[in-house]
Amino acid sequence: MSKVSVDTSQPSPYIESDSRLHMIKRKLTYAFAIKMIKKYADVRNFNSLLEIGTGSGFFMLSCKGEFPKVSLSGIEYDERLLSITRKRAPFANCIQGNAENFDLHPNKYDVIVSFQVIEHLYNPEAMLSQVESHLNTGGIFIVTTPNLDGMGAKIMKEKWHGYREDHVSLKGAKEWEDLITNNGFEVKFSGSTFFTGIPLMNKLPLGLINWFFLVFFGAFRWKKGESFVGVFKKK
């Protein structure tokens, strides 16, 4: 049986604020993913998108604003987060499901995204198999996950915030890249973010540097940042 590390008997640490400032922050966070979709997807024939792990639904809002004609769907394991997403993004078809064994066939998608989800899975290869199965040939898969090879992990060691009880599949950027390409994908972009895993870099004035790179670059083609960011194309 498929197993995930989310404990729904405890308060969810992933319920996000409705404040205007937080919504702006989230929009900036997802701007890079929107940019990658526009760059690598066949936007003239871009009709459907699936998000694995909708969280609180902020990415769905960003997509609706950028791609108003695209059919949006989502899967969320935690019913509490799913309820929030359905209220925040009623235009999207979001269901409860497990990233390792969902079955939405005969539906297929032009773009599938998953942000900070795969590290919660005991069997990430199962999710990659589902992504490959549900993605149209030539479709784009965008994934982010904590980077075990990042400077934050190396400097903070056991205090690194990526080390959590529910992060059961942590890997370095190169290891993630190899795993995904071995499951039927080719690399379009492979890199990582900046230094958000180092507390000092999140405080003023250094925090402004982090925000500058987030807003204007999103991610870089290097392997030492906080989160791995990968854009892959189904062969």
Regions found by a protein language model. Give the residues of each.
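Conserved N-terminal segment of class I S-adenosyl-L-methionine
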Residues: 1-107, 111, 115, 125-128, ...
